[in-house]
Amino acid sequence: MPPLDFEPLNEISILERSKPGTLFCFGHGFSSRALARRLIPKGWEVSGTCRDIGSKNILNNEGLLYKYDGININKEIYNAIDKSTHLLISIPPQVSGDPVLDLLSNENLNWNHLKWIGYISSTGVYGDAKGEWVHEDSVLKPATAINQRRVAIESAWLKLYKVKNLPIVIFRCVGIYGPGRNILISVKLGRSKRIEKPGLVFSRIHVDDLAQTLEASMLNPIPGEIYNVSDDLPSSPSEVVEYACGLLGITPPPLVPYYSAELSGIARGFYEANKRVSNKKIKVDLGVFLEYPDYKVGLNALLKE
């Protein structure tokens, strides 16, 4: 429930109307910060939540941060959402569900001022496709608990769109990489593994291409839609490690057969899902032109940064 002293803001100043938009991000992390870096120079106001920011809100070139423990939504956050035109949710599914979904489902609050509500999900909802291509209308076969929760939350969001006519858009993302989070860093630190599993391929997306996809949807929202977000070249994980090692002039780690590799339960589940993720819809419907169409282009760009 909202704080007792929460009062929705009814008046919008001339200054607010002159902005392209105001974005609030639940989970202002790797992906939403990349989006903020695109939007803020264009005049957008961006803010979001973070678990630990100290005692004060932080304002930087990636937006204003509000402390949020994942459970209690305070008055500051309510007011920030009330002033926003766009809302992005990138918080991973909780065992208890999605706290933001619970908030927007509240019958006592009116969120009709929101022009776009984006929810970042995962292509993990498709499960294992035996190396075949998956599209937005492919059968969902989540194999892990977290992806089963994602399917349930996606369904609840889409129900909210149908019942309350809120502008929900779902983005199913593959593995996201970019500055500060990529295989080049793992190779340099000696943490990369070269696991051999014949026929296995993964899809990836550079965080800046995810950001441009989100922006394209924000500017031309189609409520109720689902988009896969992926690059053009599904590739084997060992191939990517080898390429990264070549760029750095480092000898690749030894090739280890998957069935004898020492992997955590989460990592092993990751290697069990074999699929190629189609990105045709974001290109056709949103006009997205990938800046980093495959991992080779992406890693070469990161090497120069």
Question: Would you name each region that the model predicts?
Answer:
Residues I77-Y119:
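NAD(P)-cofactor binding segment of oxidoreductase domains
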Residues I185-I205, D209, T213:
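A conserved pocket-lining segment of Rossmann-fold NAD(P)-dependent short-chain dehydrogenase/reductase
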Residues K141-V169:
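Active-site Tyr-X1-5-Lys
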Residues S13, T213-L214, N220-A267:
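Mid/C-terminal beta-alpha module of Rossmann-like enzyme folds, strongest
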Residues L103-A145:
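Conserved Rossmann-fold NAD(P)-dependent oxidoreductase catalytic core, especially the SDR/UDP-sugar
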Residues V151, K164-L166, I176-L189, I195, ...:
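Glycine/proline-rich active-site loop of Rossmann-fold NAD(P)-dependent oxidoreductases
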